[in-house]
Amino acid sequence: MTTSDHRRPRVLVSTDIGGTDPDDFQSMVHLLLYADVLDLEGLLSSPYGDGRAADIHQVIDCYERDFDQLHRHAHYPQPDALRALVKQGAIDRADHHGRTGTTEGSDWIIQRARVEDERVLDVLVWGGLDDLAQALHDAPDIADRLRVHYIGGPNTMWSVNAYSYLEAHHPTLTMIESNSTYRGFFEPDPDDPHPVDNEQFVREHVAGHGALGDFFAAQLPRVKMGDSPTLTWLLHGERTPEAPSWGGRFVPLWADRRRYFTRLTTAADQVEVNAVLEIAPPLPEGYGATDHAHLLVDGREQGPCPDGVAQAGSITFRLSVYRLGEVPYRVRSTHPGLDGLEGAFTSVPPSPEKAATPSADHPHWWTDDPDPAQAIGRALGARWVSRYRSEFLGDFAQRLRRCLPGA
């Protein structure tokens, strides 16, 4: 999917809104204020924590309170039309095979993908990939009708099984994987002499601008909106991953990112950040059907704690990390031969040299530009977004003014 397309986009959003980060609420406000230029086809709740479809309805309630003002501008959908698009997706993370079981959300992806329409269905993933993976388990024929824009990084850490399934079993899927490019939405461009201040923007252009503006400001007193580059990529630019746009510029995915070890690793073992890692030491004698094991990674008691899957004489732990540097881990198990074992690995950035050779297996998969000149700190590719901050935030401010009386 590399040709430019300026038709009105068909958009389905999968979000972990209401879960671990309030910025999804901000991005949902952002999305609804641009609903007049999109064909919205689905709003899926795919939470890691406590978030549910009710959290999406909460934002639509604010939209309804502002609708008399928004309706002065053509093509805004009725609030009830938006409510009909809200579906509950997976509550639990995908298993080792990338499956959650069919959900209302995964089934809705299939239904919308099979609609007779020449346009691709843009699936914007603001959380885990679990519902998308389940949809492709159930209906692999829809893959070539989708264009996925995924905010990865921490989300891959949580939904590594779904990610692993898509990468391995649907390599020709059209995918934009933004592991750090998205950070340019809230990280000021180091070359901008007058960068937009995130807190000042909310005070001056968001708070007091209708129910949507007040709701946005109540979530965080500053701009974050880490999922919004998936939207702004559609609003400005050629809608081709390699072209600059408000949502970033991306490069083809390269080969050999995944690592597999048949032993516990050490800090001398290097693993590419955000890639899939599988650690598969031998099963100890006497490990039975009632035994279980998981990894405590980097001291993260809150998780995720990858479960060990026993098969073919080994026990496999699958994980992904988004932090650079040495990452320690410890095995917790009911079996004394595993419990307490420790290891580590070192998470490293991709090299521009390795990234110069695209993966032959993933012809339509794109990711962050590894060129250090386009990074902000360690956030690869972030400058491709941050250079447009004054433009897309200025445009957002104009949209927020539509919520004011008489606007």
State where each predicted segment sits.
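N-terminal acidic, glycine/proline-rich low-complexity segments
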Residues: 1-407
